Amino acid sequence: MRNMLKKEFLLMFRTSKWIILAWGVFQVLIPVVLVRETANLIQDQATLNRLFVQMLVFYPMMTIPVVCVLVFTGGVNEERRQGILMVLLANGVKQEQIWRGKLIASLIVSEGISLLAEGVPLFLLRMINGFWLSFSLKEAILLLFLVPFVAMAISGVLCLILWGFQHGQLFATMIPYLLFFGCCFTSVFKVNLIEKVSLLLGLGIFSAGVIVVIISERLVALFSNEHIVNLGRS
């Protein structure tokens, strides 16, 4: 039995190794990029540690660093970012509320994108191995759970070495994923069901995230206009 499983895993890895390796590298780099970009934005160490822990708890959902960084900064333009923060602060919004709101918005968007992205390798594998062949549950587990889990552990250690954490909070966030990873091997779901659920949830959550971002941008613009009018009157 063990030899048969070993042969199946080796065969699967040979036919789709580049997809699996690229997916793993992608998953490793994301939290490192997020940690670095966020560290440049937030100077308060206590807030920084809290946001890091929250991001790592939700990892591997944070899979698109560009989107997350854009949401966090309010745009790539430094002047625009500072202007938005000044307007919000002038309207009585606390600094911590701003970061919490941006974190929630980025989580919603990145979770949807992540679920979509996790569905794409499944279809690529299906096309490589033959479009009409249904690949095994082991392949789905490897791509959806094993690769992100291993990548999370590697990137967690990298973040710890590069940027530093207090009181070992980073490693505590891995416990839920250990339990979740163990449950995956006892799953009775079929691969096609995983594909459908992943893509449908991804589309729904991503759409909701886009709506949230659009609404937040409109609110910021509204606040900006009101603030400019008030400054003109004063």
Where are these regions (language model features)?
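Transmembrane helix segments
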Residues: 33-37, 158-210
